[in-house]
Amino acid sequence: MGAGEERPEALGFNPQKEIVYNLLLPYAHRLDRESNELLAQIKGSLGRAVRLRELWPGVLFWTRKLTTYIRLYGRKFSKEDHVLFVKLLYELVTIPKLEISMMQGFARLLISLLKKKELLSREDLQLPWRPLYEMLERILYSKTEHLGLNWFPNSVEGVLKTLVKACRPYFPDDATAEMLQEWLPLMCPFDVTMQKAISYLELFLPTSLPPDLHCKGFRLWFDEFLTLWVSVQNLPQWEGHLVNLFARLANDNIGYIDWDPYVPKIFTRILRSLNLPVGSNQVLVPRQLANAYDIGHAVIWITALMGGPSKTVQKHLTGLFNSITSFYHPSNNGRWLTKLMKLLQRLPCCIIRRLHRERYKKPSWLTPVPESHRLTDQDVTDFVESIMQPVLLAMFSKTGSLEAAQALQNLALMRPELVIPPVLEKTYPALETLTEPHQLTATLSCVIGVARSLVSGGRWFPEGPTHMLPLLMRALPGVDPNDFSKCMITFQFIATFSTLVPLVDCSSLLQERNDLSEVERELCSATAEFEDFVLQFMDRCFALIESSALEQTREETETEKMTHLESLVELGLSSTFSTILTQCSKEIFKVALEKVFNFAVSNIFETRVSGRMVADLCRAAVKCCPVESLKLFLPHCCNVISHLTINDDVMNDEELDKELLWKLQLLSEITRVDGEKLLPYKEQLVQILHRTLHFTCKQGYTLSCNLLHHLLRSSTLIYPTEYCSVPGGFDKPLSDYFPIKDWGKPGDLWNLNIKWHVPSAEEMDFAYYLLDTFLRPELQKLDLYSSGELEMSRDEVQQCLAIVHNCLTGSGNLLPPLHGERVTHLVTSMVSLNETKLFTGIDHDHSRENYRELISKTLRKLLHYILDHSEDDTKSLFLIIKIISDLLQFQGSHKHEFDSRWKSFTLVKKSMENRLHGKKRHIRALLIDRVMLQHELRTLTVEGCEYKKVHQDMLRDLLRLSTSSYGQVRNKAQQAFFTALGTYNFCCRDLIPLVLEFLRPERQDVTQQQFKGALYCLLGNHGGVCLANLHDWECIVQTWPAMISSGLSKAMSLEKPSIVRLFDDLAEKIHRQYETIGLDFSVPEKCIEIAILLQHAASTSSQLPHPEELALAIKRQGEKNVEAVQNYERLVNTLLDCVTQRNLPWKFEHIGIGFLSLLLRDDYVLPVRAIRYLVQCLNHDALIVRKMAISTVAGILKQLKRTHVKETICPYKISGCPKPESKLVGDRPDNQWLLYDSSNLPNTKEAWESCCFVEKTHWGYSSWPQNMLVYAPADQQPKVGRSREEMSEAEQIIYDHFTDEKFVDQLIKFLSLEDRKGKDKFNPRRFCLFKGLFRNYDDAFLPIIKPHLERLVADSHESTQRCAAEIVAGLIRGSKHWTFEKVENLWNFLCELLRTALSNITVETYSDWGTCIATSCESRDPRKLHWLFELLLESPVSGEGGSFVDACRLYVLQGGLAQQEWRVPELLHRLLMCLEPKLTQVYKNVRERIGSVLTYIFMIDVSLPNTAPTKSPHISDFTGRILGKLKPLMDADEEIQNHVMEENGVGEQDERTQAIKLMKTILKWIMASAGRSFCTGVTEQMQLLPLLFKIAPVENDTNYDELKRDAKTCLSLMSQGLLLPVQVPLVLDVLRQTARSSSWHARYTVLTYIQTMVFYNLFIFIHNEESVQGVRWLILQLMEDEQLEVREMAATTLSGLLQCNFLTMDAAMQAHFEALCKTRLPKKRKRESGMVGDTIPSGDLVKRHAGVLGLSACILSSPYDVPTWMPQLLMDLSVHLNDPQPIEMTVKKTLSNFRRTHHDNWQEHKQQFTDDQLIVLTDLLVSPCYYA
């Protein structure tokens, strides 16, 4: 660091990392003192606030201040302070009951403190991981959120995850082991907990431990997780998380892990995850679309594996790009394209990041990459070469060239000599073409990306700079008024190159110096063209301006403003022009200036469009060299204006002379220059202002106001005066300065030498003189007018206001902010809440008049006068609103302007940055811009402003305007009002009562406009403060009830749609933004300990609290908690009062109930009165209210739930087995006791009570948790079967209602109505309601509900059945803790009920019953539900009641068993035995269901690492049995037709028919399991393959029967499966065998299978040489097949495999085909002699055709380029054009395809052929036979 050495002395500490741009500000010397004072204040006050336990407002206020401090100064504090801040915030964030909005605020600050992890090492800081885990568990996996007891914002998940990422490097050494102990027991692959465990591990596991701790880090889990990943084949949801974890691990530990054995698998899976389409008729596996890998992480993983001794990764990467390159061609498009583009853009970016880390980054405590594994130059070159081809294709992609341009920018930093030439090759022709503008925009945006690498040349690419001038000259025609996008990209292109290069003519040096290199001499002579270029560019601009003049482009009637496009062109034009002039030498500048001056003076422009553009150009010229230019322009303009205004009549003209207006406009723009250069002309300028400021013509005085505004700004603001790319400019003699050395040179941060304009005393005097002369008289006039002493017309008032406004915005930073006393009593705090004053370069002069105060006094008086006397003068009111908001906020720059400048700065920085070297090596102009932005940021920082009386008055005025009569006035005033609300501390509390005043129903005098205005003020704007929903009890207690009561106001009318919409928006916004507000604000002791340390670290000790203060603080904290609870209850009661008012319109009642439902909490039970009201709402007339009540009552029941006692058990004691030695997952001796065992069911009271029930299904599968909890025996649990007297008041209310028959009657009636026909589903909210009832009151309500249930079940209507299903599910789940007697009675009743239900099941209701049973079985011990399972397994497929009932019973059964996963092997075996005889079912719906059920039966049979063989059914046994039955089909030769009649004929059918029926069911099973199981049983499926090949049809025809369609689908799904390396030979064997089959359909299908299989397992195949040869042999074999279709398919397959580089076109293959081509055919004569067999192709013809097909396949395998072997093959092919069919056909097709694919780039492809070859080729492609 250039300034790094002397910082500790200046500051008194060594700063961690400060924002360096602060050191370059003109007032930098004052900042250190300022920041030190602020930091001491923050440390003292933050520590004090925490010690006084005042979370709000104290801690919150000072943590915000710390956030602002970081934004202003960076991490400008010592390491010790940094650690203290982090520790304090960590403790604050993890306070258990902290309100969620505070937690998010603290978390965001903590993230920014930890963001730069190199600043704090593990030695400096350690953070525990468990508090974070507990917080995530509490919030992300909240048990009560779905019941509406907690409201979290949507952003909370992202914030928490980022927080964990930030803390992760600092977890202690033993964290990994503890995490594995915590989460491994959750890893049961059939359960949702697997997803949870893996995502926790991905988020928390630390991977950046130093090498000596690896044994405590990733070594503990690496092998286990990697083998798990390798053995999972069907992309379950959690696989993506594992990949993210591996990517991070690899990236943090480059060189410490050997990934080589896994590389083929990694690349195969990444390729599969791109979801590319292969082959013609592919069925995608549904779930793979959603669960593909995140490209960002995949790229990080690839990048981290590169380098090192073995080059396998680069080889695979090249293979990957070879296989997908053709997808990048612009003619291909699909939903996969975005992924491919992202891959292209991210890879180079990651490689650059890695190179930067290895070569340029400052070393820190993080583990460096070992020398042996760093990327070498050769590695980089190989990488760039492998990716270039896809990038060049992607340049013209349909989705735009942005990704390609970003990729090229990074690639050019690494290897310009490989990257830039091909881009230029595409650019030059694109600049010439007129017909393809897209080509031009695409190539130019790519050249802009590589501009810096091109211009700086460097050792790799010295000839780069020579291309610059030709490119610039050729780009000029792009400045084209008719093509907007072309115009903009050309401006950007020219501006980019001019910023990088000084436009100085150095051609004279050729004579003077002889020590120049060849390239330098070439550049010197080229620079002579610069002047020419600048002049031509100006001509183009002038033409553009003339064609966009107003008269040209619009009719008279249209708008006079600029259109959006015009303003963009204006911006592009002026910024490009100003860049060019900044970079010019003096000589060129003079010529240009002359030219602009003549153009501006010799024409008269209209002032709206073309005038603005010309004035901009002139301003740009004047800014570059103010002295010379002003000499030229200013006197000229002044003279013309004076001359034209000599006559006083001009003052009163309505329309002014065009020339006068144009000269005024020109003058007002050219005064936007360095203020001190204007001082010599001040008399002239003042005289002009006197003449023009009081024109009657609005256009005239507006331009004059602009002039005044610009004069004030130029003299009072601080800004840089030049942005040249080299400090000091270019006008040095060439003898001692050589400009070419500065081409593309970055700015040097430490020698920027910015020239600042800082206002001098003389300029200040001039500014005050202007204000005294022009502002004061206007204010006096307005003052008299508003006292009624002076008559003024509206136009005059507006003119006065316009002058006032321009004076204010011109001198914003000169005038001190408004003073006055603070508004107290809004909040009480024991900590000081002072505002921070920042110095922004000007010491305010308090001896002079503060015009801000004066304006505010006059304006308030005027405003009240206008509102009382002429409220319809809206234009004046608009101006007043503008002036008020500027009086409050404006200090020299506007927030929105700053934001857009910051945005464009970031864009330019990104498009030109050098990520490889880093270290802020940006061009000088950008760095200066950034320093200027830093200065503006300081002027705009108005955080935590004190709320003073002055502000209070103005805000009240704004509120009055916001509720005035005119809509537009209200709208503008509201925007200003919202901005101010966000600026002043606690002002909302002062204003809410005033806004609510308008909604009071008692008031008679409120108009509808005021009512609407007040509602809008409550609603707030997008992203700003919303008064209706502040996270604070005191505010909500006022606003919510007021909104509901306003329904009774006179001004409220539901006839007005705008008002109805407003209430809807308000309710919607409150529901969307409400977050649970805290009731408990206590601060734990841990925080206080750190706060004490922090306070001692602050140098000011005056703030240490007294013991009395501390005692008071504890008392206050208690009071605050009590007060919060009181407010909460008050709010609920007030809402109830409001909702129950008579005559309240229904809409408001609904909104009120909605508000009540938001107030449920999990730490405080709802007041009794509200419970009573909500329970009654269950039977409300309105459906929407009933729905809300159902959810709310379910939540109340959760609040009233009594806690059940748990106890710890030892699973090894229960099972009587010792703990296993090695790790074993799945069915082990020590978890057998959890399984369902029908011989040992708890069906007596003793058995039930002695049985240890484990409800959660995942426990015990993987390993046992450290502390295994189960429910304690019944005698320790809360009492069951209580009488009414034993209940609490709240419970009694619910009890009374549900024991009231009438109430229940009505409720059930309502619940069995249908809501939306055909759309209704099983409703989980209603289920929760019933579950809660039966859980809290056990069977108290059963007698009343029983008869209803029996009635509902007997009725087969959809809605009644659904209602029954919801209640039954609630009953079963609610009976979890009932005693045995009660449960037994319940099941006796339920079994009968369910039997009835299942026999009455219909199409509409079967899914509801399925959901019902699945919900009942979820997280329940199967032994508890044995009645249910025995019932369901009685006769799953009986055939009684028809096929439909069978299918439904199976569906319901499947729902129940699937929830039980691995714990019911016995039931699965029983079910399989039932089903096996029934597999030959005739009915399709039953077959499909059986297929699905089989999937679940075999799901548990997985081959994951360390898994014991399962007790559940095994696939292999089952397949063995099936194959025996399918034998008749295997042996048969003829094609299998589906000739089974759908209804069962009499008598036994033959074996064959039975086999066909069986086959259909098996196909359904294979299809169902493709997307669901984890591992594919490849070995088993292989045995079925030959049969599938036989059945599958060849053509795509939809009216094939079911069997054939299914066979085809199965083949498609199987071919996409992921193969493990051991499985590859097995598959190839089956394929070889099938290729010998007698059916050509089978041989044909083998080929389509190969295409997909090889592509989806590409690198696994390539890795194994034998399998590559096997595939090659198979295809060559089939190319000589006797069936024409098979030969053609084989050729297509070959071409595809060549294209993805699986096979290569080597000499051997070429020779093989050429030999086949030469096969002699029998003479034609012989064939014609009437032989019968002349239709059968002879063997020779087949061979010859095979050869031709081979050549054709090679040609078609490179559709987008011409490899060296191509011309010769085309010649070989042409010989066969006249061969007999089918050869002739093949040749023609090939040639026409070749022509189609190479047509686009024929010009460059032509180069590959010799002249003779071209003649033959032209002949072929246009020969007569082509059209024959």
Curated annotation (Swiss-Prot):
Lineage start: Eukaryota, Metazoa, Chordata, Craniata, Vertebrata
Signal peptide coordinates: none
Domain remark text: The bromodomain-like (BRDL) region specifically recognizes and binds acetylated histones.
Any one Pfam family match given in the protein's UniProt record, by short name: PSME4_C
UniProt keyword list: Cytoplasm, DNA damage, DNA repair, Nucleus, Proteasome, Repeat
Biological role stated in the UniProt entry: Associated component of the proteasome that specifically recognizes acetylated histones and promotes ATP- and ubiquitin-independent degradation of core histones during DNA damage response. Recognizes and binds acetylated histones via its bromodomain-like (BRDL) region and activates the proteasome by opening the gated channel for substrate entry. Binds to the core proteasome via its C-terminus, which occupies the same binding sites as the proteasomal ATPases, opening the closed structure of the proteasome via an active gating mechanism.
Gene designation per UniProt: psme4
Protein's recorded name: Proteasome activator complex subunit 4
Disulfides per UniProt: none
SUPFAM superfamilies tied to this protein: ARM repeat
One term under GO cellular component: nuclear speck
Gene Ontology molecular function: any one: proteasome binding
Organism: Xenopus laevis
Family per record: Belongs to the BLM10 family.
Record text on subunit structure and interactions: Homodimer. Interacts with the 20S and 26S proteasomes.
Domain of life: Eukaryota
